[in-house]
A protein has these predicted regions:
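Contiguous transmembrane helix-bundle modules in multi-pass membrane proteins
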Residues: 1-32, 39-154, 163, 167-308
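Glycine-rich, often proline-containing surface loops adjacent to acidic residues and nearby aromatics
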Residues: 157
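Active-site cores that bind ATP or allylic diphosphates and position pyrophosphate for catalysis
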Residues: 160
Length: 308
């Protein structure tokens, strides 16, 4: 066991050194280039923005993922440690790999390991997000343009600086929410709180409650996403009209507002289901929102465009 741990630690150290060398190489190349141009101030501004963005995203992502895992451990029952459960693929005749996974799960899913996973995943997410340093600086340092769009009355600076940052933030929120939900579902499954096999289909009340809360946050983020999509109509280009067309204003915009209202109602219902703890209600809400946004809305827009 000690030898295995030493091997893992050695691999981690080597990987960290390789990553560090790569970052140091990029740092020196950029520093040399900016120094040759006489713009070291710009270089340090970019570095500071990347560090601040990394720290903010890292902390927020780690807390969000860890909180989901910690809550799942707390509400997954009275068992101090997860136990293996029967797996649906064992009836497929290939039991070697699933058997190994089934034996490893109780030992892998520990509170400390979940915290470590949260930190590692958050580090990767934050590192990827440092590429958005320009969006962060543009949002922070924006100034009014002095002219407004005729449809929503927003200053042009909103579309140049705020909207791109909001869209990126929305994507991060959905991604982190999905990671947290995946970790919580894995813990509930390993603890026997979720089971789908030939003998039984079972989801515990605790899993339903936490899943409903996460789904409520998902619908809330989607409501905000549809609000942002209203402004993206001004970026439209159908080959004839650049900007919001007649169909966008009279069909797409009302549909987006209806989707915002639908997602808000679905979010409230999902949060309420944390006490009701019904399995069918979240599935019905998810099917309703996805069906409306991906099927009914495009069909309605297409029918209106064809009738003109």
């Amino acid at each position: 066991m000690m030898r295995s741990r030493r091997i893992v630690v050695a691999i981690a150290i080597v990987a960290a050194c390789l990553i560090g060398l790569g970052l140091a190489s990029d740092f020196l190349v950029d520093w040399t280039w900016f120094f040759s141009l006489g713009f070291l101030g710009v270089f340090w501004t970019i570095i500071g923005a990347k560090i601040a963005l990394f720290a903010a995203v890292f902390v927020a992502t780690a807390i969000a993922i860890w909180a989901n895992g910690a809550l799942a451990f707390r509400f997954a029952g009275s068992r101090a440690y997860p136990r293996p459960v029967s797996m649906p693929w064992q009836s497929l005749g290939s039991e070697q790999l699933p058997a190994v996974i089934e034996r490893l799960v109780p030992y892998l899913l520990r509170r400390r390991l979940v915290a470590g996973i949260s930190v590692v995943v958050a580090a990767f997410v934050a590192f990827g997000w440092t590429a958005n340093w320009n969006l962060a600086l543009n949002y922070i340092d924006q100034v009014p343009y002095g002219q407004s769009d005729p449809l929503f009355g927003n200053d042009f600076s909103f579309y140049l600086f705020s909207l791109p940052a909001f869209v990126a933030l929305k994507g991060w929120m959905l991604f982190v929410l999905a990671l947290g939900a995946l970790l919580a579902a894995l813990i509930y499954w390993a603890c026997g709180e979720i089971a789908f096999d030939a003998r039984r289909r079972f989801v515990s009340a605790a899993a339903i409650a936490q899943g409903s809360v996460l789904l409520g946050f998902f619908f809330a983020i989607e409501a905000w996403s549809f609000c942002l999509d209203r402004y993206l109509l001004l970026y439209g280009n159908n080959g004839v009209v650049v900007g919001a067309s007649y169909t966008d204003i009279h069909v797409e915009l009302p549909i987006l507002m209806a989707l915002v209202a639908l997602c808000c109602a679905a979010s409230i219902a999902s949060f309420a289901n944390a006490r009701l703890r019904s399995v069918k209600l979240p599935l019905a809400l998810l099917a309703l929102v996805l069906g409306t946004s991906f099927v009914l809305a495009p069909v309605a827009t297409g029918c209106f465009s064809a009738s003109m």
